[in-house]
Amino acid sequence: MTSLTIPGLDQAPTTHARLLSWVREVAELTTPDRVVWCDGSQDEWQRLTEQLVEAGTFKRLEKKPNSFYAASDPSDVARVEERTFICSREEKDAGVTNYWMQPDEMKAIMTELYRGCMRGRTMYVIPFCMGPLDADKPKLGVEITDTAYVVVSMHIMTRMGSKVLERLGEDEDFVEALHSVGAPLEPGQQDVPWPCNDTKYITHFPEERKIWSFGSGYGGNALLGKKCFSLRIASAMARDEGWLAEHMLILKLISPEDKVHYVAAAFPSACGKTNLAMLQPTIPGWRVESLGDDIAWMRFGEDGRLYAVNPEAGFFGVAPGTNWKTNPNAMRTIDQGNSLFTNVALTDDGDVWWEEMEGEPQHLTDWKGRDWTPQSDEKAAHPNSRYCTPMSQCPILAPEWDDPNGVPISAILFGGRRKTTIPLVNEAFDWQHGVFMGATLSSEKTAAAAGKVGEVRRDPMAMLPFIGYNVGDYFQHWVNVGKEADSSKLPRIFYVNWFRRDESGKKIVWPGFGENSRVLKWIVERLDGNAAAEDTPIGRVPSADQIDLSGLDTPREDVETALHVDVEEWKAELPLIEEWFASIGDSLPSSMRDEFEALKQRLGA
């Protein structure tokens, strides 16, 4: 099929020469039946969701307005880290945490995979913007995809459509993001509800600011504005331009006196990031408003402070474990509708359900389409099942969430899921020590990434799967950001662990969720000079007396266990840090080695 015969290709609502040329090149390679330029309108949403219902990909939910359920192919349920590549020109620029292939070699392989891969399908062109569209220099992208599921998800997760195309004008720069599920259809061939391919590649070309994804229709592999652009490509941009692109929530903490602090926090997947982002404090008079639950782009303002903006427009949250106790604000957000649910379970009356949601039904249809009862062996919802919902529906959304200038960050938190060793909260001695804390962040593996659940792995700044360049250079970039700033204006860095267990290893000693507001209160009191801490070998840690425990029904000894710094446990941690740093090799900054030696000295090791 020549380009002349592909309907829609020549009806482009733009005169942007590079965009037109790229779209034509992709269409000629992938040979779709038609090309559709997405405008982001409500009509487009209606049309595509109806198409997806007819195709069997979506089921319309009876109990949530304008909301839909999808079940993926059981082989396509999570990010595939072993099929995710950073194809920098030089292998050393990808570093030890990324898979690398020579860019031309990768392009040759993927070009053959893309050849004819959209046959029988529609090619959608999605202009999108990460972050507010009225920013001085917005970060623009265009995703080409062959699945309407991606288009409607991008409606929720990004600012997209005609307004972005206008902003692109005739020659504005943009990130090229090419996606195909890799499932061409022969004439008369019946489609499947969730097309995908056993061969998967999620590839990034950081110097060229390009993303090529093939074979997966799932979330982060297919919604290329999310991890691919906002973290992997953006982290490379941030290194070059002197800012930070991070896997962080942004929250606004308001004291009873209406004093405001903005906090950014980095946690690996399934460690409570979304719950903290939408926290409902249990201590009287304190309030939280949300600005984002997953990604923060931070750059210095004219006043020398670090300002954060959330590049996304929606929440793409892990469903299991989300309920009216753990995250009432997420439940209120999705209850308003206009949402997509993938790989959760379906109730008999046309609603969604997942593990730990209130009121377990006696019968469900599980994510694989089978009958499910409480006696069933398998879980009804996949552990990495997701809701995709507009941020604008969040009842505690901070009005500043859409401000292109961002909000000034007072504190940065790092945290992971550790049963031992790491105390409830720990303040860094200074910025460089805080970078060391982030660089050595560790967590037990979760379901969001394929692999063995439960093993402890290093997850620097919760960015292990998302750093778009060499991890050692990434640490150096963090150190440089601190060196080039006025240290009095830098955010203070803290490390938290909500998941410490008692000696039996069975009970999590800190109640978490809304009670985490007590830890946030201590943190902002530290910022304001109104709270004490004890200097320990690992940082500044409060005693139980220094945290507001009023009205908390957790035994004091449990709080003390949560805060305890066990020197012997920390000595056992040292070889693990040593091994991690050794794996990074020559690119590890000397400052990180210095911090490690200083920690050893303080521990008497």
Curated annotation (Swiss-Prot):
UniProt feature, compositional bias: Basic and acidic residues: 364-381
A Pfam family in this protein?
Answer: PEPCK_GTP
Which EC class heads this enzyme's classification?
A: lyase
Please give the superkingdom of this protein's source: Bacteria
Co-factor remark:
Binds 1 Mn(2+) ion per subunit.
Q: Where does GTP bind?
A: 270-275, 386, 417, 513-516
GO CC, sorted alphabetically, is: cytosol
Annotated substrate binding lies at 79, 218-220, 269, 384-386
**NCBIfam families (alphabetical):** PRK04210.1
Q: Function, please?
A: Catalyzes the conversion of oxaloacetate (OAA) to phosphoenolpyruvate (PEP), the rate-limiting step in the metabolic pathway that produces glucose from lactate and other precursors derived from the citric acid cycle.
Protein family according to the UniProt entry: Belongs to the phosphoenolpyruvate carboxykinase [GTP] family.
Q: What is this protein called?
A: Phosphoenolpyruvate carboxykinase [GTP]
This protein's species is Saccharopolyspora erythraea (strain ATCC 11635 / DSM 40517 / JCM 4748 / NBRC 13426 / NCIMB 8594 / NRRL 2338)
Encoded by which gene?
Answer: pckG
